[in-house]
Structures are given as C-alpha cells and as structure tokens.
Amino acid sequence: MADNKSCPRVDIGGQAVLEGVMMKAPDAIAITVRRPDGTMVVQRKEYTPASKKHKWMGWPIIRGVVSMGSMLSMGMSTLEDSMKMLGEEYEEEPTKFEKWLAEKLGKNIDKVVMGVAIVLAVIMAVGLFMALPAGVEALTGWLIDLFTKGASAAPAWKGVTVTVVGGITKVVILIAYMAFCGMVPDVARTFRYHGAEHKAVYCNENDLPLTPENAAPFTTLHPRCGTAFMFIVMIISMILFLFVGRDIEAFWPRFLLHLALLPVVAGVSYEVLKGLAHSDNRFTRIARWPGLQMQRLTTKEPDMQMLEVAIVSMNVALHGMPENAPLTEEGWAVLTDYRQSEKGYAFTDEEKAAILDKADEDDDDDDEDDDE
C-alpha cells in the first residue's frame, strides 16, 4: 500500500451530489458515490477552465460571471452523473412522455433535458430572488407614498428605504429556501456530504494526510462555499442599487435593471469572495462571518463513510484514476476502501476479483428482487 502522504497544495473545490461528492481540481473533475452495498464508484473527467481557452475570461469581474455559469452547468451534469453511478435502484421508471422524447431525440435527450433543467433553474432563481423582491420594493414604495400623501415631494429617504427593504427580502427568501430544503430528508443527507466536502478541502489546504480521522475535526463552514457567495451577491446587490436606479419605482423597469446588472453583481461578488477567503485579518474575519453562518443551513456534520467518499474524490481529482482498479462497464472504478484511491496504490488480482464478485452478487440479488 502507498504511503499516505498529503496532497500537493492546489486550488480545489467541489460540491455534494446524490450520495457522494464531486471535487474539481485545476485540470479534472472527480465524482464519487457510495452505493447501497457499501462500495464506492468513482469517475474522472478532464477539465479545461474557460480562462485557459480564452484569456479574457480570466479577467477580474468577468471570471466571476464565467464561473457562475460554469458551476450552474457543471452542478446539473454532476447531479445527473451521480444518479447514473448509483445504479438502477435510483432510476425511476420513465414516463410515457419521457419515452416519447427518447424516441424523438435519441442520443440527444440528455443534452435537451439538461438544457431544460438549467433554464427552469434560472427562471426559478430569477423569480424568487429578483422578481419577488422587486415586487416587494414596488409595494414598499406605494406604501411610503400612501403614508406621506400630501407632501410636496417624495421623502428623500424613500429610495434608500425601498432598496434596503428589497435587499432584506432577498436575504430572508434565501434563508427560508435553504431552511426548507434542509427539512427534506434526502436533501439533508446531501448537506452532510456538503460538510464532508468542506472538511476534505480543509484537510488538503492544511497539508495533512488525507484520512477521515484528519478531516473529521475541521469545521463544515468554508469561506469559499457557494452559500457564502450567494449571501455576498445579496449584499453587493443592495449596495449597488443604493446608488444605481434607486429612484426607479415602477416594477418592470426596476426588475429589468436588476436583471441587466446581475452579471456585474456576480462578477464583483466573486472578487469579494476570493479576497475574503485568501486574506486573514480582523476585517476579513468579520466580513466572512455572516456567509459562514449561512452555511449552518446547507452543511451538516458527516459520518466517517461520507468523509471517505470526499477523500476518494479529492485523491482522484488530483492524481488520476486508481491504476489497475476494477471497472464497471461504463469505465467507473469500484473501490471498497478510500486508501485504494491514493496515488501509487496497486490493486492485487485477489482484490479485484473480490470486488467484482461482490458486484456480481449484488446484481444477481437485484435481478431476483425484480423477478419477485
């Protein structure tokens, strides 16, 4: 077995998926899930950042917009991949509509479904976090006019009040949405894998050997988390609109202005997130605190098995797929121990045979259950 040495320090992050963790290294993405039989299935895909293809996409502000779009697309695709990797027991019987789509679209159905899912996610996000707050802002402006009726002019504080109320509304909606998601058992379990991802990242950042025991003591709250990013977006948005368009009262012009400036808000927020994450002083610790507290809603304490999954993803993202590992028909590696993902680990023929035999037994059991 290879010595369990720490990973080289590189910029690596990830996300929780169904019963697993995705880790993104500078040049690859690894997804690991734990199947009901206890085995871990892992895949690795080569990854080239957009900034390497087009230099201008790595410029400040612009890179934040690119990163947001990339993570949305990547998040959807990794969730789909994790469901496939979990096996048939997690796949629902396709509906008549899905069967009809499959006949019409053939191999392109996955791309179409993914595109529709992304569009729906964007529409929901825009509706919840932009249209609804804009409506509250319009209502607030109307109420101010109602209670100051008879005044020669609108009060000077009206624009500021409307903008602050809109910003607070966004934060309240975000908190309520995340709290509601955490009440769903499957999502709550995914939040535990989210915590495992953060602990593994901390372990790597502190140059410790990647083991569940070393990762466990770390907090589940990480300054570079997407939850913190969303909170920063809300705050930057509120600050920006204190100066831009605060006197626009009608719903549609105000909503469209917020929508048009969303890329600017996202780009600035990304730079703020990176700055706060990579600096450690009294000011940055205070500024990071609200975003870290928001993560108490989206991360939960993982168990040791979840930490093992996160560590496998990190090892594979950094070092590549385990050599000579037993593979599924799809080319995914099957592991029974997180140490099998360490760089330089060599599977024995006996190990491979035992893992494949176990997989065959589980498949036979599933077939018998289907026959019953």
Regions found by a protein language model. Name each.
Residues D3-D11, A16-V17, S51-G58, E98-M114, ...:
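Cytosolic juxtamembrane amphipathic/interface segments immediately preceding
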Residues M1-G87, P94:
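Divalent-cation
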